[in-house]
A protein has these predicted regions:
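Alpha-helical transmembrane segments and their immediate juxtamembrane cytosolic regions
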Residues: 1-168
């Protein structure tokens, strides 16, 4: 269900994202970050599936899923590309590791430094603080709040795009 929601909102967000990035409603030049998150979620699902398999050779499809997720992220021009998919996987695999914050911080730094054309993504590193402080418990979980957070992404991009087109 989570993947279906990501897919739905990736589709809904694409037109405003294209408008923001290219000034056109349709473009294959860039794809929004929800596609990256969707690919990352599918790779994480494959990793969970592989944990249930007793034989090493039975886990090969999960390894293939990592490669396919990376390639689709790169070829699909998703925000942050295949490296973003791997970053999602890093956060997933280290979620229960003691000292995870250090691994995630180093991973994010290396990602920002080596895998993005501009170093401006380094400014996103303070966003790790709320992630590190997350206690693992679900917060308020009614549908209005849940879909409000999902809707925020395409709505704010659309507003910024319209402002950029007509005000600035």
């Amino acid at each position: 269900r989570y993947a279906v929601r990501l897919l739905l909102f990736a589709l809904l967000s694409e037109l405003p994202f294209n408008l923001m990035c290219t000034g056109q409603w349709f473009s294959l030049q860039y794809q929004n970050v929800l596609w990256t998150l969707l690919l990352g979620a599918l790779v994480c699902w494959a990793m969970d599936w592989a944990k249930t398999k007793p034989e090493m050779w039975q886990r090969l499809p999960a390894d293939a899923a990592i490669a396919v997720g990376f390639i689709l992220g790169q070829w699909g021009n998703t925000d942050y590309g295949g490296w973003g998919v791997l970053l999602v996987l890093l956060f997933y695999l280290t979620r229960e590791v003691r000292g995870k914050w250090a691994i995630q911080l180093v991973g994010m730094f290396l990602f920002c430094w080596f895998c993005t054309p501009w170093r401006t993504e380094l400014l996103a590193m303070p966003a790790l603080l709320p992630i590190f402080l997350y206690n693992g418990e679900r917060g308020l979980s009614n549908r209005a709040v849940q879909y409000g957070f999902y809707a925020f992404y395409p709505v704010h991009i659309l507003i910024l795009s319209v402002l950029a087109q007509y005000v600035f």
